C-alpha cells in the first residue's frame, strides 16, 4: 500500500515544479493529487497551501525579506518555498498552531538541506511568529500604492488602476474581498452516493 503523502512536503514540490516549468497551477495541482494519496483533510490543506501561497506571494516575500539575513532570491528553491508555505500558514491561517507550523517547516528544511538550513528556518519563522498581528507593511501615508500592493499582494499597476477608478477606501475593500477564500458548499445526491462514502 502506498504511503500517504505529507501535504506540506507535496506543496513544496508543487511550488518548486511550478517555478521550474511555468505550467498552469490547476494542472500541476490535479496531477500531484492523482499521483499522491491524500486524505480529504490533507487534500484540502494541500490545495489551500498551494493556492494561498501563490496568491499572497508578494506579501509573504516582503515578510520573509524583513527577517532573513540572506537575500531570499539567493536561498535554495525548496528552502524558500518551505519558508513561504510556513509564513502563509502563520500569517493567514489559524487551523494549525504556530509551534506546529514551525516544527514541521524545520523538519522539512533539514530534509531538503542540512542542520544549518533547519536552524536558519527556525530563526526566521520564530521572528515571523513574534511579529504576527503587529507586522508593519509599507506605510500608507508614504506610498498608498506600495502599501496596498504589498499588504494585499497585488501588483502596483492594478492597485493604481483601482485607485483611479474607485478611490482609496473602496480599493482597500476590493483588495480584501479578492483575497477571501470562497466558501465551498457540497450538496450530496443521496440517490447516487451516501455522504459517508463521499467523504472517504
Where on the chain are the PLM-derived regions?
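Class I Rossmann-like S-adenosyl-L-methionine
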Residues: 1-200
Amino acid at each position: 500500500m502506498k504511503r500517504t503523502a505529507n501535504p506540506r512536503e507535496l506543496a513544496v514540490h508543487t511550488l518548486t515544479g511550478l517555478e521550474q516549468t511555468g505550467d498552469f497551477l490547476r494542472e500541476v495541482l490535479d496531477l500531484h493529487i492523482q499521483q499522491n494519496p491524500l486524505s480529504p483533510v490533507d487534500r484540502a490543506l494541500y490545495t489551500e497551501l498551494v493556492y494561498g501561497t501563490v496568491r499572497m506571494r508578494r506579501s509573504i516575500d516582503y515578510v520573509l525579506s524583513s527577517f532573513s539575513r540572506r537575500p531570499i532570491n539567493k536561498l535554495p528553491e525548496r528552502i524558500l518555498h518551505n519558508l513561504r508555505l510556513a509564513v502563509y500558514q502563520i500569517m493567514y491561517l489559524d487551523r494549525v498552531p504556530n509551534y506546529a507550523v514551525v516544527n514541521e517547516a524545520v523538519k522539512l528544511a533539514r530534509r531538503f538541506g542540512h542542520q544549518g538550513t533547519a536552524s536558519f528556518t527556525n530563526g526566521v519563522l520564530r521572528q515571523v511568529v513574534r511579529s504576527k498581528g503587529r507586522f508593519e507593511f509599507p506605510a500608507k501615508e508614504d506610498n498608498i500604492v506600495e502599501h496596498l500592493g504589498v499588504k494585499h499582494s497585488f501588483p502596483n499597476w492594478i492597485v493604481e488602476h483601482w485607485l483611479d477608478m474607485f478611490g482609496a477606501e473602496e480599493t482597500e475593500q476590493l483588495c480584501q474581498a479578492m483575497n477571501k477564500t470562497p466558501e465551498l458548499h457540497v450538496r450530496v445526491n443521496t440517490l447516487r452516493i451516501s455522504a459517508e462514502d463521499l467523504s472517504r
